[in-house]
């Protein structure tokens, strides 16, 4: 059996996006027609269940290019490829395939309770989850991104970074949640690298 001695559950990359790029993506959200996000795992697009998930979303087409020429889709894919090569070591075929990029807006008690990004049906092919923080951490209260693993100090759960422009990568099978936003607005991106189901 081959071991993976470099594995970490959660990877952070600060300054993945500039503040200007974050602002542009927030504007894209506000200029679009957001919809309520469903709970994934059905081919019908996800059941709306606000007891579990309450957030607005805008789905972007693939190959998202920002006004400064930054190829968002390409850079997320490259970051996931490097993370997989160095850290996760999942069985993924090249070229890596990315699911839709989804812009999210959490406000006024919006949340997403404990869940996995992988499940049945269309979510069964998710391998690596990617989150980008678009809001400044001073712009909202609550809304912490929390994982169901202990941190280095042995505390019960581990929190993702709140720093603006940061990329967070983790396996789709890792439990996580977004705590309710109690003040202000939290914008973020979520997407997934896809591959054959884990075996």
Residue locations for each model-derived region?
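Non-heme Fe(II)/2-oxoglutarate
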Residues: 2-95
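Catalytic core of non-heme Fe(II) oxygenases with the double-stranded beta-helix
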Residues: 70-73, 77, 81-199
């Amino acid at each position: 059996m081959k071991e993976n001695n470099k594995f970490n559950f959660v990877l952070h990359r600060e300054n993945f996006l500039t503040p200007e790029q974050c602002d542009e993506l927030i504007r894209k959200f506000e200029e679009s027609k957001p919809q309520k996000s469903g709970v994934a795992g059905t081919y019908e697009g996800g059941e709306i269940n606000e007891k579990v998930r309450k957030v607005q979303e805008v789905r972007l087409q693939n190959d998202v290019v920002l006004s400064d020429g930054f190829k968002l889709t390409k850079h997320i894919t490259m970051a996931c490829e490097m993370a997989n090569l160095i850290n996760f070591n999942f069985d993924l075929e090249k070229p890596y395939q990315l699911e839709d990029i989804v812009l999210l807006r959490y406000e006024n008690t919006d949340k997403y309770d404990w869940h996995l990004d992988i499940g049945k049906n269309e979510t069964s092919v998710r391998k690596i989850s990617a989150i980008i923080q678009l809001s400044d951490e001073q712009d909202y209260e609550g809304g912490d991104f929390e994982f169901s693993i202990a941190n280095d100090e042995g505390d019960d759960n581990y929190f993702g970074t709140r720093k603006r422009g940061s990329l967070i990568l983790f396996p789709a099978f890792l439990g996580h949640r977004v705590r309710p936003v109690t003040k202000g607005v939290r914008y973020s991106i979520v997407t997934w690298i896809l591959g054959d189901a884990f075996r």
